[in-house]
């Protein structure tokens, strides 16, 4: 059996561009958020996406208890916010750095996000160090900004919507 080592896997994954997202929650366990690129569509019937979350992350217990989350997809220019939510900054400072609305699930929804998916966690599957959170989408909010933000080759890149 050929086992791929961790560094080879990580180097190869850096070749896969992905949207940059801030995942937020609020509920009985408190308010929390983190930056994630491990987010993708599962199905449109019913509308479902998935988010991967390391069980060793400081935010894991909060998301695990609240069972709701909002995927806030960032637009170009929001790199500092991504870095803030991706570090060890206290939660109150993370949330103070942007404007938020409360979504239908009670989760913080970033006002200037490219798109926000307000969700309830419907299923959790554990694989290795991570939980895969399957999220039933209850509401979607889109912003008119024409620029997206992706993480590719270990750095941020802006994308522009084509003119119609």
Swiss-Prot record:
EC number: 1.5.1.42
Protein family: Belongs to the non-flavoprotein flavin reductase family. RutF subfamily.
Function description: Catalyzes the reduction of FMN to FMNH2 which is used to reduce pyrimidine by RutA via the Rut pathway.
HAMAP family from the UniProt entry: RutF
Record keywords: Flavoprotein, FMN, NAD, Oxidoreductase
The species this protein was found in: Escherichia coli O139:H28 (strain E24377A / ETEC)
Xref: PANTHER family: FLAVIN REDUCTASE (PTHR30466), FMN REDUCTASE (NADH) RUTF (PTHR30466:SF1)
GO molecular function, one term: riboflavin reductase (NADPH) activity
NCBIfam families: RutF (TIGR03615)
SMART domains: Flavin_Reduct
S-adenosyl-L-methionine recorded as keyword: no
GO biological process, one term: uracil catabolic process
Induction note: Up-regulated by the nitrogen regulatory protein C (NtrC also called GlnG) and repressed by RutR.
Protein name: FMN reductase (NADH) RutF
Gene designation per UniProt: rutF
């Amino acid at each position: 059996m050929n086992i791929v080592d961790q560094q080879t896997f990580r180097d190869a994954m850096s070749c896969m561009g992905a949207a940059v997202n801030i995942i937020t929650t609020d509920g009985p366990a408190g308010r929390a958020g983190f930056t994630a690129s491990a987010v993708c569509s599962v199905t449109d019937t019913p509308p479902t996406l998935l988010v991967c979350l390391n069980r060793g992350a400081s935010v894991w217990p909060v998301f695990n208890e609240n069972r709701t989350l909002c995927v806030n997809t960032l637009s170009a220019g929001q790199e500092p916010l991504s870095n803030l939510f991706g570090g060890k900054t206290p939660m109150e400072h993370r949330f103070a750095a942007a404007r938020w609305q409360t979504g239908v699930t009670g989760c913080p929804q970033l006002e200037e996000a490219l798109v926000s998916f307000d969700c309830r966690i419907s299923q959790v599957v554990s694989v290795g160090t991570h939980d895969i959170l399957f999220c039933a989408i209850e509401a979607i909010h889109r912003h008119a900004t024409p620029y997206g933000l992706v993480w590719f080759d270990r750095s941020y890149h802006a994308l522009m919507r084509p003119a119609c």
